[in-house]
Amino acid sequence: MLSDCLLNNFRITAQIGSGAYGLVFHVVDILTSREYAVKTVFKSSSMDEFYNKNGLNNNSQVARTTLLQTQLYHFFKSFQKKLFLPSVDLDSILQLTENELNRLPHYREIAFQLRVQSHGNIVKIHQVLESSIATFIVMDYYDRDLFTSIVDDKHFVNHGILIKKVFLQLCSALDHCHRLGIYHCDIKPENVLLDRNDNAYLCDFGLSTKSKYLAPNVCVGSSYYMAPERILYCLNTTTNGIHVDECCSSLPTDTGDIWSLGIILINLTCIRNPWLKAHQKEDNTFQHFANDNNVLKKILPISDELFTVLTKILQLNPYTRIDMKTLMSEVSSLTSFTREGPLSQVPILSSEVYMTHIIRNENLFLSDLSHFSADQEQQQQQQQQQQQVQEQEQEQKQEQIQNQEQAQQQQEEEDAEPESDIPSTYNSDGSMEKYEYTNNHNNSTFLTSSMDSTPYQSDIDDVSASKDCKFQQDTLRNRLLCLQMNFSTLTDGPNEKWLPDY
């Protein structure tokens, strides 16, 4: 119906969302080709006038959406489908007082979002265009929300590290809001957008407040994610000993957002809600949980680790709920989300990886985060291996010192033994052979050997020494034979057989 309508330099391409008092469109800047989302917030006075004029009521969501589309279409048509609207200075919106915001309630959402949008995981407002029937808010565009990714795409089924990344980014954004005194009050998957790199962005501050304490008789947000103290029907009940209708004004607002985070964590890990409403009289499951929190382990496939964290988040008494910093730390340290399946083992994220690669890097891919986590584990393994190598080297050094001491002691014992005049040599098997002279001149063998049965281990490979000694033995034998023959010639006369033949 509104396709191709021009809003200043933005061309409307499609409607991507709707609410009680507004519509959301996908637009393209015709000058830069950049995509944006434009939220159209209708002024309550114009809506009441339109309903009264047509005799209609706004009870049906479909009826409301149709009426909003029709009214906006006629508005564009009256200007030939081209609107040129003035842009409101964003700084001037931040300067609006509380009284001025009360007179311009549709600007309260804009002012709160502008105040906190410096965080990297909160959707940013770029322009605010004003008309007589509606205010147009130009914001960042992301093509999917957390609800679609969880339920329709099953995007988190096998990715424990991705669950940590998205959940911690959401916690960080919400913690930033709380520190600046803004409480969202409508945390749910539909209000969390995701980019192509699976980074999360908090949006829709339409129900947010600056009040630190709950306003009496006020019930806001989706019943699936609302804390029990925020539900209107709890006003006549007691919550863990606290009578809500008597001290509703003293109950903190921020802990209600933390409760909603706990339900989202269950959505991410189990793809379901634990109950329809956190009300003991209207929801049987929640009533059983209020009596015994172990019911969570019976209805959900969660691990003991995750159960421990959830019991700290889903405290019925808002004053005893876990704080944001502790929650972020404990989720970072979880090693499992479920008892079985791919989420039964989840990498631990160190504070360095979390601060550097989750919060500060908006363009981080999941593969990069897995790589950082794997590098951390690899570094730990390398450190363990280096420590083992050092221990082995130290053991080897001690062993060498002991061997040297033993060798030195053995050498000293050998040096203390008397030296023998008998020549010796070594056989190929390492045993020592001793040679002794004899006085038998008639025996052609002048040397006899006796074998020492004990091998000399230090020279067991010295084969060449044995061969040299044998050669010397043969040479000495030949010389002795010659001397013997010469001696017989001198005593018995010449032997003709011995004389050379001339």
From Swiss-Prot:
Q: Which Gene3D superfamilies match?
A: Phosphorylase Kinase, domain 1 (3.30.200.20), Transferase(Phosphotransferase) domain 1 (1.10.510.10)
Catalytic residue positions: 186
* Keyword Nucleotide-binding belongs to the record: yes
Q: Which reaction does it catalyse?
A: L-seryl-[protein] + ATP = O-phospho-L-seryl-[protein] + ADP + H(+); L-threonyl-[protein] + ATP = O-phospho-L-threonyl-[protein] + ADP + H(+)
**Residues that bind ATP:** 16-24, 39
PANTHER family recorded: NON-SPECIFIC SERINE_THREONINE PROTEIN KINASE, SERINE/THREONINE-PROTEIN KINASE UNC-51-RELATED
Official protein name in the record: Serine/threonine-protein kinase SKS1
Q: Which organism is it from?
A: Saccharomyces cerevisiae (strain ATCC 204508 / S288c) (Baker's yeast)
Q: What is the lineage of its organism?
A: Eukaryota, Fungi, Dikarya, Ascomycota, Saccharomycotina
